Amino acid sequence: MRTSQYLLSTLKETPADAEVISHQLMLRAGMIRKLASGLYTWLPTGVRVLKKVENIVREEMNNAGAIEVLMPVVQPSELWQESGRWEQYGPELLRIADRGDRPFVLGPTHEEVITDLIRNELNSYKQLPLNFYQIQTKFRDEVRPRFGVMRSREFLMKDAYSFHTSQESLQETYDAMYTAYSKIFSRMGLDFRAVQADTGSIGGSASHEFQVLAQSGEDDVIFSDSSDYAANIEFAEAVAPKEPRAAATQEMTLVDTPNAKTIAELVEQFDLPIEKTVKTLLVKAVEGSASPLIALLVRGDHELNEVKAEKLPQVASPLTFATEEEIRALVKAGPGSLGPVNLPIPVVIDRTVAVMSDFAAGANIDGKHYFGINWDRDVATPEVADIRNVVAGDPSPDGKGTLLIKRGIEVGHIFQLGTKYSQAMNAAVQGEDGRNQILTMGCYGIGVTRVVAAAIEQNFDDRGIIWPDAIAPFQVAILPMNMHKSYRVQELAEKLYAELRAHGIDVLMDDRKERPGVMFADMELIGIPHTIVLGDRNLDNDDIEYKYRRNGEKQLIKTGDIVEYLVKAIKG
């Protein structure tokens, strides 16, 4: 490609509304332009990256035995009502009507559509297992789209769905998808972790997320420093302390704390170690419980894990925190004065809280706390459960090493769905015994547009993007200095351009009448990995300047060797 025949829409200034580096650089590099909130037009440079990501995904899915299909973005509401998600999905599901006032949705996922297809196409266990995938536009009406294509409303996704007659068969395909995803992200040159995850709104049993490690990531990625254990923050188990509870050394005393309504204020005003404090959070109980609220206790320096808490059988789903009015009606004290002593509702405490002694907590009286509380002496030990987020330094749940925490961007997710959708939609085949058998399903997603942004978050410097070779919009930039005045430079540029393209290398030749500084800045901004500079001075010595974008190193290479050098650098 020649810049004279290309739309190179680079920007010098960073747009004010771009918060994260990928959004800033995608705008500045001329990859995307905003159309409306959460909606983006992809420009030629962006599309080239997108297609390379798609191609890698498609190749590895095909290699893993998946079959490509293409399903409609617009889906009839009847399918969503049949699966039960019409009511469950919430406002992210964009509901529309056609001219006949028939309700439809813009698909955020395609479980219903593929299940409907399969129940009408398959009739025997002999046709299974099968794994279908598509690369298709999705739409989720995010309440606050942000971070460019990282959290947009419309996005491109690879979603796959597998169908089985046994859990063993599902596990085989699940493992194959795990391997395929690992190959996909490795080929793209990304630093990623596959982590155990909660199944969330999709449902099902086993689940893994594929997280690209990046400082700007929205997720906490947990992994051991001594093993391959990895999980997301919602799933990671906080192991119970091995040390037994220490003996009581203090009497419980009631202390006036009128200005301490938070743990931080209590610690500061009374010089308490935060590890000796407990915070009490009240949430709604399941309908029909003797008490409308449940108390959840975690150590003062720990955070409640809402996913774990919601899974407690006595806690209502979705997890809902009690309002101050509801708390006062039941406990007669405000949220900043709650604690386990004389609390008239059921209590669940975290494993760490269970081994605490001589601790401080609210007295369930406004402006007062109890200091020196001890379990079984001052209050009976309640139910104990893992309800907190892990922290760095916690022991790894597999018993090997301690936990580290890094930020991550979720780019892929695989689920063992089981029979959630097939049961609801009666997707069955004739089994080996001649009876109807409900199908077991898996689903496997990759956010194609999100991968592009995540790759940038991991590969940039102060001059722009640093693409890995496999997904760069162009692999080589040819910068001919003063080519419009130097026939020698022009002739060599054209020769190298043709030779590199003949080797299947994506080349961008900058044939604009621009200053060298502008040409260099643009090529670095859009992140082309390999740049060759042709100038009369170096050509006098039969040399070409080569620059590698990732480390900025320059070297002179003989004109007769440059093509071979680049082919080897790119293709190995």
Swiss-Prot record:
HAMAP family: Pro_tRNA_synth_type1. Homodimer. Consists of three domains: the N-terminal catalytic domain, the editing domain and the C-terminal anticodon-binding domain. It comes from Klebsiella pneumoniae (strain 342). It comes from the Bacteria. Catalyzes the attachment of proline to tRNA(Pro) in a two-step reaction: proline is first activated by ATP to form Pro-AMP and then transferred to the acceptor end of tRNA(Pro). As ProRS can inadvertently accommodate and process non-cognate amino acids such as alanine and cysteine, to avoid such errors it has two additional distinct editing activities against alanine. One activity is designated as 'pretransfer' editing and involves the tRNA(Pro)-independent hydrolysis of activated Ala-AMP. This is Proline--tRNA ligase. One of its GO terms (biological process) is prolyl-tRNA aminoacylation. It is found in: Cytoplasm. The gene is proS. Its main location: cytoplasm. The keyword Aminoacyl-tRNA synthetase applies. Keywords: Aminoacyl-tRNA synthetase, ATP-binding, Cytoplasm, Ligase, Nucleotide-binding, Protein biosynthesis.
